[in-house]
């Protein structure tokens, strides 16, 4: 019987995406997240409130490796990679532990973290292996979160979808920068966007996004490609959305202003509290005006508008 190894990394919440992606780059076959914030204010589909859970500043990233991988080498490589990034982000004191799993345990552990989740009034994210009957008017996003890009329920993703729901009216062109699982592209299509162009620097993300898009019928209007932010892109868009770390977002704003049509929008998420002022200042210096600012826990998201009429924007 094949066995698997479970490697758990305890890290500050803002390090979730960074550590998850590093673990995948170091050979993980899947990653799951345990975050006490996921239970705050949650209700199930019948309206029942989940029990109170003590809130922690740290989350646990669990990575799965086949027994052919030497996880001690993975641990050492992970520590080395993170030490190079400590100037950009305080991840706290890493705690790392490993456990051996049988193959059937791997399958059970992998899927137990993922349940259907109502993200907005109209959109529900459903794991690809789950039978789910939609209610009247409910739109379903099928996702297979099997390669670490999450289930779409992280606060940064939720706020991105809220923002898309705010600005999309139908018929728009959308650029999805750092698409990851492809969830924001799929959401954009369901919310009426005419054409979506999704980019990611990571070849794994490009493949996973394409696979998730194929799980959802009618998504022929989504085009996925490898790309480094918006470098070399010449497609004008009504909306640009980027759910990536703040230290990467700051390299996006000038190209975004070049490509967003007049009266169009730039949505940015994945911004920790300490980086918010920096991101806002750079977006405004590029020419955008802040229209909406959202906060959930440590995370910030925002909607900026490219407009000459500033009467309806913050500070206008």
From Swiss-Prot:
Catalytic activity: L-lysyl-[protein] + 3 S-adenosyl-L-methionine = N(6),N(6),N(6)-trimethyl-L-lysyl-[protein] + 3 S-adenosyl-L-homocysteine + 3 H(+)
Localization of this protein: Cytoplasm
Pfam family, one: PrmA
Biological-process GO terms, alphabetical: methylation
An annotated Gene Ontology molecular function: protein-lysine N-methyltransferase activity
GO cellular component, one term: cytoplasm
Sequence positions that bind S-adenosyl-L-methionine: 157, 178, 200, 243
Gene3D superfamilies according to UniProt: Vaccinia Virus protein VP39
Keyword terms, alphabetized: Cytoplasm, Methyltransferase, S-adenosyl-L-methionine, Transferase
Family: Belongs to the methyltransferase superfamily. PrmA family.
NCBIfam families tied to this protein: prmA
HAMAP family documented for this protein: Methyltr_PrmA
Known function: Methylates ribosomal protein L11.
Record protein name field: Ribosomal protein L11 methyltransferase
Organism of this sequence: Streptococcus pneumoniae (strain P1031)
């Amino acid at each position: 019987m094949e066995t698997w190894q479970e490697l758990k990394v305890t890290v500050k919440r803002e390090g979730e995406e960074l550590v998850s992606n590093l673990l995948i780059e170091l050979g993980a076959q899947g990653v799951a997240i345990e975050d006490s914030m996921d239970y705050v204010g949650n209700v199930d589909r019948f309206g029942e409130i989940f029990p109170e859970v003590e809130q922690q500043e740290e989350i646990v990233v669990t990575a799965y490796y086949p027994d052919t991988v030497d996880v001690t080498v993975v641990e050492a490589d992970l520590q080395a990679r993170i030490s190079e990034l400590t100037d950009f982000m305080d991840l706290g004191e890493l705690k790392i532990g490993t456990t051996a799993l049988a193959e059937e345990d791997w399958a059970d552990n992998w899927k137990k973290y993922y349940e259907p989740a109502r993200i907005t009034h109209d959109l529900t994210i459903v794991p690809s292996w789950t039978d789910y009957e939609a209610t009247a008017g409910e739109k379903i996003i099928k996702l297979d979160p099997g390669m670490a890009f999450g289930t779409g329920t992280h606060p940064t993703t939720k706020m991105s979808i809220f923002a898309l729901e705010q600005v999309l009216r139908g018929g728009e062109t959308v650029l999805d920068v750092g698409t990851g699982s492809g969830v924001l592209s799929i959401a954009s299509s369901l919310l009426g966007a005419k054409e979506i162009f999704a980019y990611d620097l990571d070849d794994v993300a490009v493949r996973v996004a394409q696979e998730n898009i194929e799980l959802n019928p009618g998504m022929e209007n989504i085009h996925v490609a490898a790309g480094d932010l918006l470098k070399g892109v010449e497609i004008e868009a009504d909306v640009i959305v980027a759910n990536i770390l703040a230290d990467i977002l700051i390299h996006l704003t000038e190209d975004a202003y070049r490509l967003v049509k007049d009266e169009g929008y730039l949505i940015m998420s994945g911004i920790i509290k300490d980086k918010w002022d920096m991101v806002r200042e750079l977006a405004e210096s590029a020419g955008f005006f802040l229209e909406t600012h959202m906060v959930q826990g440590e995370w910030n998201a925002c909607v900026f508008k490219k407009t000459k009429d500033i009467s309806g924007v913050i500070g206008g």
